Amino acid sequence: MKIKHWDRWLASLKDDDYLKNIEAIKLYLAVMSIYEPDLLDEYMIDDDFHPMISRLKNVTLDVTSARFKELYITESKMNYARDELDGAMIISKTLTKSDIVGNVALPKAQVMSVLTRMNGVTDEGLDNGFEVQVHDIMEDDLYTVTLKRIDDMKYYFGTGWSTMKHSLDLVEGDVQKLYWDQFENKFIVLNFQHKTMGIMIPV
């Protein structure tokens, strides 16, 4: 459901419908607070919307993890697919045989670009191995891999790469694209249609 239509949907709910959809309502508010905080503020002061919020505050809800996953992950996919991604924060690599057999070598210039917006990264940390998270939002799988630098200016994924490549069923010739989200402090696997600098990039 489009966020801009959500207030009308909520206002149209009758008592029975409201109770049936209470989980969706609370979770959608939580997602909006993350991705559309300004829009949520507008809804909070809307005369038609405010009574529903007042009622919502009095509801205690045990939200199942499955329901949260369904709504939260769907919204995440929409966000990364809809918004234009900064190309300077994308690492793209066509995988070679050696990448599949062992560790994956990463493009130097792209890694150095991403490093400018990584928090807590030091030269010593890169030399010893710096753990980063990689999120496949399509499957809601989260991987931890070690980003490491050798010979001063060569970068690769070490520990954790084996698990990630097998889980994603990667083979030689596949193009692996990762987007660094500096606000979430993790990489997003770009295995869905997305936009970069106004251009729609197919999977």
UniProtKB/Swiss-Prot annotation:
It is found in: Nucleus. It comes from the Eukaryota. Disulfide bonds: none annotated. The keyword Endoplasmic reticulum does not apply. Keywords: DNA-binding, Nucleus, Transcription, Transcription regulation. One of its GO terms (cellular component) is nucleus. This is Putative B3 domain-containing protein At1g50220. Residues 99-195 bind DNA. The keyword Transcription applies. It comes from Arabidopsis thaliana. GO terms for molecular function: DNA binding. The lineage of its organism: Eukaryota, Viridiplantae, Streptophyta, Embryophyta, Tracheophyta. Its main location: nucleus.
